[in-house]
Design a protein with these regions (language model features):
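Fe-S-dependent hydro-lyases/dehydratases of central metabolism
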Residues: 1-193
Length: 193
């Protein structure tokens, strides 16, 4: 399910019939999310590094303040203000103090079949809703923001066969933490589980 779903999503976003692991494709992005951890860096690059800057489609952007709420220093407050002002100036959906960015995304934006870039490593959690989400850095986020596209390396898939029933008091979180403990924090980098 996971592997075929990711392949179908990437193929559709790339406008091709099929893709295979290891391929690199230019894709159209359905949504881009950034939080207060790095948005100020993207805004600085947009304002200071681009000639004739523009945003491809502001309706695809979501900015969420969730990492430092309330702000813990004047520097953080200034970064969040920069983010807030940029969102207002460009009519970008802006959320502040409404929850963790990924929960806001899951409850309000993520739809099955979408390809989503987020400036956060937990963006891959959107796979739980049948979307392809991946975390990117500021430069890739900015490129996606101004072009509406980016590149994607089609990930390999890792299949985990789980059998049996979880004992009482053991939950999905315990299961994934056990798997991560066994494979290591980097055990499935750029792979779909």
């Amino acid at each position: 399910c996971c592997r075929s779903n990711n392949l179908l999503i990437i193929a559709a976003a790339a406008g091709v019939d099929s893709v295979k692991p290891g391929d690199i494709h230019t894709v159209k992005l359905d949504r881009l999310m950034s939080n207060d951890g790095t948005t100020h860096l993207t805004v600085d690059m947009y304002n200071n590094k681009l000639k004739n800057p523009h945003i491809a489609d502001t309706s695809k952007l979501v900015f969420i303040v969730d990492h430092n709420v309330p702000s813990d220093s004047p520097k953080t407050a200034a970064s969040q203000k920069k983010m807030r002002d940029f969102a207002k100036e460009h009519n970008i959906d802006f959320w502040e103090g409404k929850g963790v960015c990924h929960q806001v995304m899951i409850e309000n934006y993520v739809r099955p079949g979408e390809l989503i870039f987020g400036a956060d490593s937990h963006t891959c959690s959107y796979g739980a809703l049948g979307a392809f989400g991946t975390g990117v850095g500021c430069t890739d986020f900015l490129y996606g923001m101004v072009t509406g596209t980016s590149w994607v390396l089609v990930p390999e898939s890792v299949k985990f066969n789980l059998t049996g029933k979880l004992p009482e008091g053991v939950y999905a979180r315990d299961l994934i933490l056990t798997i991560i403990g066994e494979i290591g924090a980097n055990g499935c980098n750029y792979q779909a589980m």
